[in-house]
UniProtKB/Swiss-Prot annotation:
The lineage of its organism: Eukaryota, Metazoa, Chordata, Craniata, Vertebrata. This is Putative transcript Y 12 protein.
C-alpha cells in the first residue's frame, strides 16, 4: 500500500494544477471540471475524494460552488473560494 506522503506527491505531479477551476460536492466527489482533464488513476482519485471530504466543510457556500486549486511544487496545494476568497492550504 502506498504511504500518504508518496501518494500526495504523485497526486500533485499528475494533476494539471495551474489555472484549474473545479466544483466540489462536499464529501463525495468532483462533479464539474472547467478546462481540466483528470487522469483516471487509482492513486489520484482517492486523494480527490479525501480533498473533498476534508476541505469542503470549511466553506459555508454549499455544494456546487467553484473553487480554485493551485500548487507550487514541491510545496503543497492551496484551495480558495471564488466568492469570498477564503483561502486554505493543505
Amino acid at each position: 500500500m502506498i504511504d500518504p506522503e508518496t501518494r500526495h506527491k504523485a497526486f500533485l505531479k499528475a494533476w494539471p494544477w495551474q489555472n484549474s477551476t473545479i466544483t466540489f460536492v462536499p464529501g463525495l466527489a468532483i462533479c464539474h471540471y472547467s478546462s481540466v482533464q483528470v487522469p483516471r488513476r487509482g492513486a489520484i482519485l482517492p486523494m480527490l475524494y479525501a480533498l473533498c471530504y476534508v476541505k469542503m466543510p470549511s466553506f459555508q457556500h454549499g455544494p456546487g460552488r467553484m473553487y480554485h486549486l493551485t500548487c507550487d511544487w514541491p510545496r503543497k496545494m492551496s484551495l480558495s473560494c471564488h466568492v469570498c476568497r477564503a483561502h486554505f492550504r493543505d
